[in-house]
Amino acid sequence: MNELDATDPSDWNQTKIPSLKGLDSSLRCLICHEYFRAPLITSCSHTFCSFCIRDYLREHPMCPACRAPEQESRLRKNTILEEILESFKVIRPTLFEFLKVENVPKPVLQAPETVIAQDSASGDEEWEDDLASNSSPASIAKKTSRDSKKRKREDLVHCPACSNLVPHNQINQHLDSCLNSPSSPSSSSSPYKNKDNSKSNSLLSFKTDDDSITKRRLRSFNSADELPLKDRVRLPKLTYALLSESKIRSKLSEMGLPTDGHKQLLQRRHAKWVTLYNSNLDQKQPVSKRNLIRQLIDWERVQSKSIGVEKEKLGGGDWEKAYAEDFADLINRAKQSTTNKNDSLRNTAVESSTEPSTSNGFPATSVSPPLTIDLTNSQTGSDGPQS
């Protein structure tokens, strides 16, 4: 199946087995709602895409499904689910075409008498044909041979290594010899061949690429050898609060990433790159570094459009023109506030200067002068001169 094909679990509603919708949904990520890509399982047994869960845990340290506490270091690869998904994606188009309900035109209903007559006539003819066919020895022998072939085919199973039909009681010996041999036997060397090409008899008629699936599954056990050791080292996270802007910029420069922008932009760029790089290591077929850088640039472009402010217009003349009225209003408010404050201080100073004060700083109180009595004049006038 092509990765660009848009599929949805509701596609199975118009097939002969609508319950396959549940199987299709269980193979999709709860975050991006697409088929798992490098699935990782959490400590609470939930599975997500490697990139989706790493990007989510960067902002929310919890499981998106059950909200349980989770850390990126606890994530583990879900290899068996990835193999099941690869097989399902191969057979999905053929399975969908096989189970698709065809729009067959409804037959025109006839009169009841005619229908009954035709049914009875056809029934009599079929009964006579059955009697004639069953009575001949050749037909009996043919039927016996057909039944024996059917039973013989039911006793056969597919070898998971070479996809050949092998009797079920000999599958263990055949599997040992098939895996130990330097080259697996080809499907043409098997004495049993699937000759049933009819789509209506069995699901074994699907033309799937079993050999390629088997090879990918066998290679999964040696997935550690797919990348060199130096390319499989995961990038550590950084504590940006302890790093200066120049240090973060140098880290990005060492990785060959853009170094323009302010510190917050550099932090987001580095964090996104760590998520992209580490999730790419979980892929069976990791993409190149150039592809990852292109994804990072596309992500930054989308982020800048969502904010609605272009980088080159920050602090420019367009910004001043757009908010000129707001700036003028803020300036007027600041001037008015300063004027009111100065008037208040001036009035307070005038009031304090008009009040008399003592040396100790407190206002002076009005005190009447002391009463003085001239004792000399009063004493002379009353007694007179003495001789």
UniProtKB/Swiss-Prot annotation:
Keywords: DNA damage, DNA repair, DNA-binding, Metal-binding, Nucleus, Transferase, Ubl conjugation pathway, Zinc, Zinc-finger. SMART domains: RING, SAP, ZnF_Rad18. It catalyses: S-ubiquitinyl-[E2 ubiquitin-conjugating enzyme]-L-cysteine + [acceptor protein]-L-lysine = [E2 ubiquitin-conjugating enzyme]-L-cysteine + N(6)-ubiquitinyl-[acceptor protein]-L-lysine. A zinc finger (RING-type) spans 29-67. Residues 240-274 form the SAP domain. NCBIfam families: rad18. One of its GO terms (molecular function) is single-stranded DNA binding. The keyword Protein biosynthesis does not apply. Pfam families: SAP, zf-C3HC4_2. Residues 177-192 have a biased composition (Low complexity). E3 RING-finger protein, member of the UBC2/RAD6 epistasis group. Associates to the E2 ubiquitin conjugating enzyme ubc2/rad6 to form the ubc2-rad18 ubiquitin ligase complex involved in postreplicative repair (PRR) of damaged DNA. This is Postreplication repair E3 ubiquitin-protein ligase rad18. PROSITE patterns: SAP, ZF_RING_1, ZF_RING_2, ZF_UBZ4.
